[in-house]
Amino acid sequence: MEDRYGREIRSFRLSITPKCNLKCFYCHKEGRNEEHGKLMSADEIGKIVKSSLEFGVRKIKISGGEPLLRTDLPEIIENIKDDQIKDISLTTNGILLEKYAQKLKDAGLDRVNVSLDTLDPEQYKQITAGGNIESVKKGIEKAIEVGLTPLKVNFLAMDCTINQLPAIMDYCRKIGAILQVIEFIPMEEELKHHHIDVVPIEEEIGKKADQVFTRKFMQNRKKYIVDGLEVEFVRPMDNTEFCGHCTRIRLTYDGYLKPCLLRDDNLVDVANPLRNGEDIRKYFIKCIEEREPFCKAQ
């Protein structure tokens, strides 16, 4: 199904918990800055995802909070699996990944994205309020070992981390990971000074690239191959290309469909209607009808 702007719905991002075992100073909590309603069960998540298939969803991204804190995560993945779904991936901080990688693979998870903003152990502790970077590295190694690949490293480009980019690139190249350089979206006034313009950085990477591809169904973002390393840039801020080619809807941990990454004022309740025995397809239609590019071309 397409929205009013001709954008197909192909991807569904599921936040399955607000809880996290780190406390990164920049975290936007998927747009839900306070704990709200009841957490969805594994069965409810499965039913909502199965309903989404009718509207064109073919890729699932699981996130949190930290999704590995849910002990029923393997069950959630098993409930999501369907022949129509081409890809189930998960975004994690990696702290618990070494422990659970094999179980997730066995349940049907295809691949993981791991957040890693620095390779400096002390800086990592500062950013995450006490996290152990060695646990993350071991988790990455285990994920690759069991086949949760292609593994992507999510690097958040900020004023305090950008000097780590060359080292992160070398690390990803060494382990065979894809690197995603993500623009920081400051959700609070006191964090705005951490934002940096990643356009010049992307342009510099582009000059060094051996090959450049365009990902049509991922906001038309570019993919650069630099000395064997695959690098992508995710630039949501003031980006008409990002918004104009968005194919994703989202589900909050408490059961609301979220039409737009950058808005929290047009959520559509789907969990409570499901619990009341309603046909939830009309709520997907409402969500899709609510979709519009946050940044529109002039």
Swiss-Prot record:
Residues bound to [4Fe-4S] cluster 2: 243, 246, 260
Residues the record lists as binding [4Fe-4S] cluster 1: 20, 24, 27
Keywords: 4Fe-4S, GTP-binding, Iron, Iron-sulfur, Lyase, Metal-binding, Molybdenum cofactor biosynthesis, Nucleotide-binding, S-adenosyl-L-methionine
Source domain of life: Archaea
Keyword GTP-binding belongs to the record: yes
This protein's pathway: Cofactor biosynthesis; molybdopterin biosynthesis
Biological function: Catalyzes the cyclization of GTP to (8S)-3',8-cyclo-7,8-dihydroguanosine 5'-triphosphate.
The name this protein goes by in its record: Probable GTP 3',8-cyclase
Organism this protein belongs to: Methanococcus maripaludis (strain C7 / ATCC BAA-1331)
Lineage: Archaea, Methanobacteriati, Methanobacteriota, Methanomada group, Methanococci
